[in-house]
């Protein structure tokens, strides 16, 4: 199965409602879609999200990295030489993790097709069903409460609440949400780097003292501030998860060695794809640190790849793969099957994606 070409397209899907965090507001999913064409007629699908404020990657840079560096490095190679292809992918250009992720995902799709097995089984096969949380965007406490109630009515058992703009207002948001939904639903909070270490400690301890029952807090401080992250971890009882602080396996090893956090959020757009995400999973097993598999605001192609990885590995105990359910429609034929919070993988080779209607 020889790689003959890499073709780039686009997937644009409006959201059901605007997606708001501490750093941005978005109205649609806009992915760069990759198809790897082979001499056998097999096609591998991958995609990448433009997330300039997180990864530094935008649509133009993703396309440029693929067309000008990645394509010329791996076209002509055989999928059976998989490790060699991944080494070329890693080394052909510095950074550009989203572009690398898109191609990596398509390569793994072909790898599964080559050996006639769904990807999650090749990667470990721990389970074939998952349950995701759903994100509640930053808005007024009243609107966030309404959105939370709506999500619970749809069967979601875990909500991820976006905070990080104003600690006092964030605490009010949590109070109003708990009042609206009760205590049977899990709440996670994601500050998206929005707090300073000391204010994070104050806010989280106040949340705990009020009995608001928070499962975890994600990236409370700036990504670069590992000492601040550790300070928060050491001074609160609510488990702290690193997100933007961990892109690479090297980043993961550093925060694990420091015990700067309690958990890690793995995202394929940060790691450069599945191959580096697997290395983080291996490190997490060694250090005994559970992981979440998360996504950016992505469509179903790349999220399906994340679902396969999450299903394969025991160390991935928390799932934040809600991108497809935030979209107003599904333009991807095949792939992971969503029923609100419930995700099921089909036993088709690779990712099980047949095409894209967009």
From Swiss-Prot:
Pfam families cross-referenced by the UniProt entry: MR_MLE_C (PF13378), MR_MLE_N (PF02746)
PROSITE patterns: MR_MLE_1
Cofactor(s) the record lists: Mg(2+)
Name of the protein: L-Ala-D/L-Glu epimerase
E.C. no: 5.1.1.20
Keyword Isomerase part of the UniProt annotation: yes
Pathway of action: Cell wall degradation; peptidoglycan degradation
GO-annotated molecular function: L-Ala-D/L-Glu epimerase activity; metal ion binding
């Amino acid at each position: 199965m020889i790689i003959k070409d890499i073709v780039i397209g686009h997937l644009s899907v409006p959201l059901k409602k605007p997606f708001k965090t501490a750093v941005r507001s978005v109205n649609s999913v806009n992915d760069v879609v990759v198809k790897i064409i082979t001499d056998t007629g097999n096609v591998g699908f991958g995609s990448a999200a433009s997330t300039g404020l997180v990864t530094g990657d935008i649509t133009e840079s993703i396309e440029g990295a693929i067309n000008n560096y990645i394509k010329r490095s791996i076209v002509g190679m055989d999928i059976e030489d998989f490790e060699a292809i991944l080494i070329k992918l890693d080394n052909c250009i510095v950074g550009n993790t989203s572009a690398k992720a898109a191609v990596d995902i398509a390569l793994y799709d072909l790898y599964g097709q080559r050996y006639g097995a769904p990807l999650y089984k090749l990667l470990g096969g721990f389970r074939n069903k998952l349950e995701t949380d759903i994100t509640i965007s930053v808005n007024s406490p009243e609107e966030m409460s309404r959105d939370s109630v709506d999500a619970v009515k749809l069967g979601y058992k875990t909500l991820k609440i976006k905070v990080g703009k104003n600690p006092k207002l964030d605490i009010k948001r949590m109070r109003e949400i708990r009042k609206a939904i009760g205590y049977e639903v899990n709440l996670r909070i994601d500050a998206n780097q929005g707090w300073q270490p000391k204010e994070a400690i104050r806010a989280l301890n106040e949340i705990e003292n009020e009995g608001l029952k928070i499962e975890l807090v994600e990236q409370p401080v700036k990504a670069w501030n590992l000492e601040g992250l550790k300070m928060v971890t050491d001074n609160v009882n609510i488990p702290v998860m690193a997100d933007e602080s961990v892109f690479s396996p090297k980043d993961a090893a550093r925060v694990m060695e420091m015990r700067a956090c309690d958990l890690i959020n793995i995202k394929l757009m940060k790691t450069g794809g599945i191959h580096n995400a697997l290395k983080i999973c291996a490190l997490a097993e060694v250090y005994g640190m559970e992981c979440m598999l998360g996504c950016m605001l992505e469509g179903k192609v790349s999220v399906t790849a994340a679902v396969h990885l999450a299903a394969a590995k025991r160390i991935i105990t928390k799932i934040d793969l809600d991108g497809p359910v935030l979209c107003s429609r599904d333009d991807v034929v095949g792939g992971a099957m969503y029923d609100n919070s419930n995700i099921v993988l089909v036993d088709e080779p690779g990712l099980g994606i047949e095409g894209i209607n967009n």
